């Protein structure tokens, strides 16, 4: 395959043993696809499917008035264009959203006519609120901040059977239960109690016998028994009776009387157990009926009502037990044939019969009344109310919705096939079948469901969550509309008078703004963004809660394979509740996770890929991706390791149906970025995956030497890089933008053949890290669609680069790497390897107060000129100013309340005029502990308020930039068009033209070059056809100019109109500070294998351990961090990184030769490196120039890819090390025979250490836990109101709590005065602490401790318990 523009600049050598059958799918597809389906904005109204907004509207409309005379129908909806784009919304603190307008129709019926006829119809578009739009990268901009809606994993609608595992009853008996869960509506539960009576409950209310529900749906006791039992038939005799003989019902029973065949020969004696031989003998004897004694009938249960044939009187009821008196009554009434229920102790329990006995309701109405009383206790049951309630419970589409998923799950669980046909409400059959399956379970047949199986849990995505909220808003609107529809006719109302969009806006706003699933996007680096969008949470509304979630829900389940990552989940209370989607997983139409497999046809692995959900997968045998195949795609081994229904086993190749797509299929994005993951302990891999998300982007990103090959996918899919939308030639590049002239074949007619990519420069992310894009193309480069044009934060040549490659030595060093501490060389800090830029946003608002407006100004009293010298005339700081804590950024004064003046002051006022002290200084200052450079200032002014100079200049700059974009587009379009015109004109005959061009003359290039290009249109061509083309060209150019002018005007209008600010705010100013954070002791760092630590010391280069050739180590880690933690992957990474660097050094040596030899020798060496082991690279497809450019990029090390579970083996690493360090080099550097260790020397003494040390390169990250953000000190500051003790925490500028144990320590030392000082004047003795302050100012260091405020609080608490407590003062 051909390499892309960036790939061929730096080819990653892969150690994968097998080619990828399928590329990693687009990583944000789930989010984008889901929201697209929800909006269906670009779909024509007629083609819209019933999903998302369309489904919400059509489920609520039409709305009919109470009297049925007016109805409001939904026609269609349309989404408008958003007013501001994403960037503008972020700057102005707005929501990126589109206005939603629905076309509705009001139909009024004529009251006068007997049959309904339409009197009038009014149609109108009604505004329905704003719907937030998703950005191209799957996030939302809500109130100026980027947020992500996390998908929710919830229990699928359907019917589920389970038991209590013997925990409810002390006997340990299993109590079975069933539950019907709809998508919305009442839950229906069925459960057995310890006495084997079956109950049902609605919405977890009081339980009632299940036969009440069966009677309520119209069944009689007879039909209930007929549905759940088989019958035994008896013919009554004057003494005893004859019983129909059914052989299988007798097996294993104890004979209660002698059983004889037709000839009277006894086959089974009394009190003997009947076995299979007896039954065979009886069958051979041809027995149809058996004579049974009288007492055999006692205790049996009648299946039907027994009626006296003569009088019609009921002698005995169905479900009555037969006693002597009942038998006599039946004989007296001349009843011959009776039917009883067939039950036994083993697998035919009498449960429904027992339940029927416990149920006292007489008929259907009584049953429904009982249900009504349970649902609405205390309300009088009228017949209509009872009927309505029962219908609304399970049968009304308004209140009950199983959804397609629910219907499919119910059908498949009740054995009706896997389709979703059938009503979306419950049916009587569903209820009956469910009870039947539950009774069968109690009888010991069938299996309970596993609720943690991914076939029983489904994912709700953004679109579905938003749709539910939208529907909730519409329901509120519906209520209001119903009320008003009655007046529609009389008051001549229009649809927009009926519909108020507030409830919809409120529901949407609440969901996007404050739902548990709408989260502040984690934007530390590209990986954290992408992982956040692929997250699947079991928490949230309608999900689990942390406290209730047990161990099983959190655990890894066999069905997670290929769907949910078994590694990546947070540590702490949320473990296992928040998961990440696996690399290849996607959602099917029902919302279940599915994963791809390669189909095996006739024992041969094909390239056909099928996606299987957890339910479908259980029917197949699936081989793993690393199973050995021959060239034809058949399995090599006689036994293949496979999975079937969650179990692992070995089986013959002929039995296998599918095979995994890739070894990395089971892990998530973050876990798939860990090289040698297969050698790490699971707990550490979890930490590694989580900590990569906290890596701070470095100033100069550096690609990992040892990667896994997924880095490019992540960088591109996350949207941090800039990708070419269309192929073409780079026309212009600077730091801010890339301009591309599009290839003709990719350009749509009538469109501008220019793509301009404005790059994001020094922008603040949600986590205050810096987002900055840098172009990586040069003018004249040819790029194809999808090529990377610019790197973003943490990307290097289009690959994810979270950290830096560091030379690491595993050895102890003077205790500075005790307990995971990290020793770092000063050179790392000097080279700015881990320096990162953090951007802080500081905001100040000028409000309109009661005493007058606040003012942004440079004119502030009581401030020295030196404090104001960074401000411009408007009182706003200059861009580029370096500021530190407490410097003024924006001058602001607030009017102060009038104070009562003394007569003297009044006199002075009268003489000297107004004094300027009636304002106080409330300027924006730099917070404590922060220094940085001002990189941007934004000024927002309310409509109708005059802009200051600064605001105007910002707008002018913005317009100038926009104009330049338009001019560039125009220039390229015009050049392109004029080139074509020139080709057409040269050599043509003319009728005349400018500069006295004679008729019949032929046009030349020189003549055209002499003219101004716009004068070419004045040439009159002889050929009519060409003249028309020339005229059209002129028109299209003028049209383009006009379009661009319009675009510019629109932009200017947008910028010059006032800004929308919160009420009472006149002006808002945002100042952005760039803070440079260098690496320092106390910063947290980590590798990718969960090997984290804190920088303990930064040591001078000359003191670091160094190699024989003088190369000092960058980082010294403790070797004791490896064995107990079992993350051996880091050691392998170090070895392979060492090889990667060595190969780079060898290439650098070759490049020192003269040019002609270079390409040849380098090509040979690269062939060796890339094609000795693992998958091969196509070096031969590159030209000599490209090979040399590649070699230049590889001088600092050849990047390797060792994919997860398919990576480099020890032998391969050994081979690479030999290629990298030939014998002469190894000897010079004093490496050991394996090349993986070296003899090091102590930098301080120059002595050799006493044994060789493992040394090599590891990709090491700096995490977002920086000591600068945590370090904090307080002198004086705010106090808590009630206790008067200092607040806690850095954010409140609080103090350090001198806690209980610290007090014990001072008590133990007997330091009583220190202790007194700590508990009084340094804490909450109010008078004491003010006194101390005064004393210190006077230079008199005496303390006088008084009563701590907390004691007064205690006294008050005791008084609140009605105990009076007074102090005796002496």
UniProtKB/Swiss-Prot annotation:
<dbReference type="InterPro" id="IPR007641">
    <property type="entry name" value="RNA_pol_Rpb2_7"/>
</dbReference>
<comment type="subunit">
    <text>The RNAP catalytic core consists of 2 alpha, 1 beta, 1 beta' and 1 omega subunit. When a sigma factor is associated with the core the holoenzyme is formed, which can initiate transcription.</text>
</comment>
<dbReference type="GO" id="GO:0032549">
    <property type="term" value="F:ribonucleoside binding"/>
</dbReference>
<protein>
    <recommendedName>
        <fullName>DNA-directed RNA polymerase subunit beta</fullName>
        <ecNumber>2.7.7.6</ecNumber>
    </recommendedName>
</protein>
<dbReference type="GO" id="GO:0003899">
    <property type="term" value="F:DNA-directed RNA polymerase activity"/>
</dbReference>
<dbReference type="InterPro" id="IPR007644">
    <property type="entry name" value="RNA_pol_bsu_protrusion"/>
</dbReference>
<comment type="similarity">
    <text>Belongs to the RNA polymerase beta chain family.</text>
</comment>
<dbReference type="GO" id="GO:0000428">
    <property type="term" value="C:DNA-directed RNA polymerase complex"/>
</dbReference>
<dbReference type="InterPro" id="IPR037033">
    <property type="entry name" value="DNA-dir_RNAP_su2_hyb_sf"/>
</dbReference>
<dbReference type="Pfam" id="PF10385">
    <property type="entry name" value="RNA_pol_Rpb2_45"/>
</dbReference>
<keyword id="KW-0808">Transferase</keyword>
<dbReference type="InterPro" id="IPR014724">
    <property type="entry name" value="RNA_pol_RPB2_OB-fold"/>
</dbReference>
<dbReference type="InterPro" id="IPR010243">
    <property type="entry name" value="RNA_pol_bsu_bac"/>
</dbReference>
<dbReference type="Pfam" id="PF04563">
    <property type="entry name" value="RNA_pol_Rpb2_1"/>
</dbReference>
<dbReference type="InterPro" id="IPR007120">
    <property type="entry name" value="DNA-dir_RNAP_su2_dom"/>
</dbReference>
<dbReference type="InterPro" id="IPR015712">
    <property type="entry name" value="DNA-dir_RNA_pol_su2"/>
</dbReference>
<dbReference type="GO" id="GO:0006351">
    <property type="term" value="P:DNA-templated transcription"/>
</dbReference>
<keyword id="KW-0548">Nucleotidyltransferase</keyword>
<comment type="function">
    <text>DNA-dependent RNA polymerase catalyzes the transcription of DNA into RNA using the four ribonucleoside triphosphates as substrates.</text>
</comment>
<dbReference type="InterPro" id="IPR007645">
    <property type="entry name" value="RNA_pol_Rpb2_3"/>
</dbReference>
<dbReference type="InterPro" id="IPR007121">
    <property type="entry name" value="RNA_pol_bsu_CS"/>
</dbReference>
<dbReference type="Pfam" id="PF00562">
    <property type="entry name" value="RNA_pol_Rpb2_6"/>
</dbReference>
<dbReference type="GO" id="GO:0003677">
    <property type="term" value="F:DNA binding"/>
</dbReference>
<keyword id="KW-0240">DNA-directed RNA polymerase</keyword>
<keyword id="KW-0804">Transcription</keyword>
<dbReference type="Pfam" id="PF04565">
    <property type="entry name" value="RNA_pol_Rpb2_3"/>
</dbReference>
<dbReference type="Pfam" id="PF04560">
    <property type="entry name" value="RNA_pol_Rpb2_7"/>
</dbReference>
<dbReference type="InterPro" id="IPR037034">
    <property type="entry name" value="RNA_pol_Rpb2_2_sf"/>
</dbReference>
<dbReference type="Pfam" id="PF04561">
    <property type="entry name" value="RNA_pol_Rpb2_2"/>
</dbReference>
<dbReference type="InterPro" id="IPR042107">
    <property type="entry name" value="DNA-dir_RNA_pol_bsu_ext_1_sf"/>
</dbReference>
<dbReference type="InterPro" id="IPR019462">
    <property type="entry name" value="DNA-dir_RNA_pol_bsu_external_1"/>
</dbReference>
<dbReference type="InterPro" id="IPR007642">
    <property type="entry name" value="RNA_pol_Rpb2_2"/>
</dbReference>
